[in-house]
Amino acid sequence: VIQNKSTISDETKKRVRKAMKELNYHPNLNARSLVSSYTQVIGLVLPDDSDVFYQNPFFPSVLRGIAQVASENHYAIQIATGKDEKERLNAISQMVYGKRVDGLIFLYAQENDPLVKLVTEEQFPFLILGKSLSPFISLVDNDNIQAGFDATEYFIKKGCSRIAFIGGTKKLYVTQDRLTGYEQALKEHKLSLDSHRTFFADEFLEEKGYKFSKQLFEYDPKTDAVITTDSLLAEGVCNYLNEHQLNVPVLSFDSVNPKLNLAAYVNINSLALGRTSFETIFQIIN
């Protein structure tokens, strides 16, 4: 039926396919690998399939690190993505139930993720590139609270006191942690925390950085430093500052466009994160 052979009647095919759908059945495309029980394939779960993901310098660098170690271990990579959560869940289901991959690496971390819930319940090998609140989930991550603290303190030690923070969506743990570090640094140095100086983008886009910069400097023209958690946001901030001839220092995180005139950047070792991610999931599988 699955192969649509002509020797099977249409009525029989219809009944079997209906049963497959009700049973949530997915064909195992790697049955030929039953002898070894390994597919030699790792699945990568992307946060979305938009151009924004591929434009962000962080992810290609991570992917390069993963691909390097995968190749060294004779593994292939399969990408699971979709335009929304439902499509991504379907892609993951096919990988897990069809045993198309040996394990999964999530290239993002967010609260109450139904995809993570699925693989956890199925006890399928997986790893999160980022943070998890569960002690039972394997992960690879930087100390983003400390990174946010250090970035903020860098400006404070240079005499800045009206420091803005422009980050991604608060659903992402990385945004939450860097914001926490930012707030801790302000508190430790007895500087006031003004919510009008913190902004959160639902997408990492240059235009978001530009838009937030406009709002920021209309609110406080004396803002003396800007921290962005992403290089695309930083690009938008720098474009706004250049257009309005504002000499305000900007700091961003890893994989920064060398054309941007940044005061500093935080190296989050994206290539090493990718390499370590594959090494870790490989150990889990074996």
Spans of features found by a protein language model:
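Short, well-ordered beta-strand segments
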Residues: 43-45, 164, 227, 251
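Flexible loop/turn connectors
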Residues: 214-286
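Short beta-strand elements in bilobed, periplasmic/extracellular small-molecule ligand-binding domains
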Residues: 70-81, 183-210
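Secondary-structure junction motif
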Residues: 165-184, 235
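Alpha-helical recognition/docking segments in bacterial nutrient-uptake
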Residues: 37, 41-44, 48-153, 216-218, ...
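Hydrophobic alpha-helical segments within soluble ligand-binding/sensing domains
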Residues: 140-165, 180, 206-214, 234, ...
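N-terminal helix-turn-helix DNA-binding module of bacterial transcription factors
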Residues: 1-40
